[in-house]
Amino acid sequence: MRRRTVIVWVAGVAGLSGCLFADDRHDGPPELLGFGEIEVVIDGSSVDLSEDRFQAEHADNYSLAFHLHEGDDFWYMEGEEPVTFAEGIDALPYFAYEHASGADIVTYDGAVYDGRDPGTELTFLVDDDEVDPTQYVLSDGDDLHLEITTEG
């Protein structure tokens, strides 16, 4: 009976070793490059980014490069390289970002907000200063604010 216990224990430890120890493919956990606050406001209403569907723990399509976690209101950036504001928005579940004909275009929950459309304005702010989201590379502590307004 003791022999079976030892065999099961050794098999269990061997099975866990891939989760607990770094191998040739990984040098350890990704480095936290930064975190800060984020708010998205569409026509005066804040998007509740604390909903489970936006959190890395619950989302099917989250990115380590830029993501949210349950339990706080911060964005997190991990990985090899920092991302731009635009890349961060594009990495969030249920959001997409593109730049076309000199205009910002954000899709949220299937609704497209195109800066080329009359009456549609997208404003990207970092620490209350307007930035070009395709050029601004996020830094630790940045307070991000995306304001989308439409007429009608």
Where are these regions (language model features)?
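N-terminal secretory signal peptides and thylakoid transit peptides that target proteins
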Residues: M1-A14
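Ubiquitin-like/PB1-type beta-grasp interaction modules and other compact soluble beta-rich domains
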Residues: V8-W9, L20-G152
